[in-house]
């Protein structure tokens, strides 16, 4: 997909009456436009990162297309932009659904929540077996779609390998998810056996055993520090 230049005037016109979904101290980061599409802004980095060579907007678009190619729903990319101030942006149609975190928060029956966690375990294994290393994987970046399937959002920080992930990369992925208090309780405490059962539907026994040992070790360390 070609990258278009977006002037400040055109940006202001595009975002007129838009709803700010996410912002930081420098301004809006994600905007819900009046036509129900979204615009995600990536500001120029002041230090070296891989995004200095390949803008995060382009990585977002490339990863979205590659994921869709292997059957994982992601936002549909409409346009890519470079802005005169050095920022970049991606214009896309959102996936219809709610984050897995929101859905789990709304479930009151433990058995229903457990079944959903098991399904997520299978989905996570699918990502790992297909070589998807989503560095920012957490329950706020996984959507439960209207048909009940899972999709991914905010996919700029990702690498897709030609073969299944190594055990070390799977461990790093889990460590990232363990940083989120609510996610950790649902996935690795309350419904950990369900998560393992789902993961085992697709992943190898060695991968399942590695996941189990890592979570158990983290639990022991937390209790020791407590």
PLM regions: where:
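A short beta-strand motif that forms the metal-chelation/ATP-contact edge
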Residues: 89-94, 149-155
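Hydrophobic residue at the +6 position relative to the catalytic HRD Asp in the kinase catalytic loop
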Residues: 137-144
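Short alpha-helical scaffold element within the canonical Hanks-type protein kinase domain
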Residues: 113-117
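AlphaC helix of the protein kinase catalytic domain
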Residues: 100-109
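C-lobe/activation-segment region of protein kinase-like
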Residues: 151-226
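Conserved ATP-binding subdomain of kinase catalytic cores across diverse folds
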Residues: 8-99, 119-130
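Conserved catalytic-loop position in the HRD/HxD motif
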Residues: 131, 136, 154
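Juxta-kinase regulatory segment immediately upstream of eukaryotic protein kinase catalytic domains
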Residues: 1-19, 218-223
């Amino acid at each position: 997909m070609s990258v278009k230049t977006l002037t400040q005037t055109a940006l202001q016109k595009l975002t007129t009456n838009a709803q700010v979904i996410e912002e930081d101290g420098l301004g809006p980061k994600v905007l819900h436009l009046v036509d129900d599409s979204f615009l995600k802004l990536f500001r120029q980095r002041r230090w070296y990162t891989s995004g200095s060579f390949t803008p995060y907007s382009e990585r977002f678009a490339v990863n979205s297309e590659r994921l869709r190619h292997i059957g994982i729903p992601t936002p549909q990319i409409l346009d890519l932009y470079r802005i005169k101030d050095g920022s970049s942006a991606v214009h896309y149609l959102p996936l219809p659904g709610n984050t897995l975190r929101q859905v789990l928060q709304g479930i009151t029956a433990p058995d229903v929540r457990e079944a959903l966690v098991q399904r997520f375990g299978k989905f996570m294994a699918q990502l790992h077996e297909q070589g998807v290393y989503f560095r920012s994987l957490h329950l706020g970046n996984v959507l439960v779609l209207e048909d009940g399937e899972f999709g991914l959002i905010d996919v700029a920080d990702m690498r897709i390998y030609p073969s299944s992930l190594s055990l070390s990369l799977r461990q790093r992925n889990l460590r990232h998810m363990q940083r989120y208090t609510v996610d950790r309780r649902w996935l690795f405490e309350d419904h950990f056996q369900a998560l393992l059962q789902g993961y085992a539907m697709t992943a190898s026994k060695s991968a399942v055993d590695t996941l189990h040992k890592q979570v158990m070790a983290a639990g022991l360390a937390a209790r020791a520090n407590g």
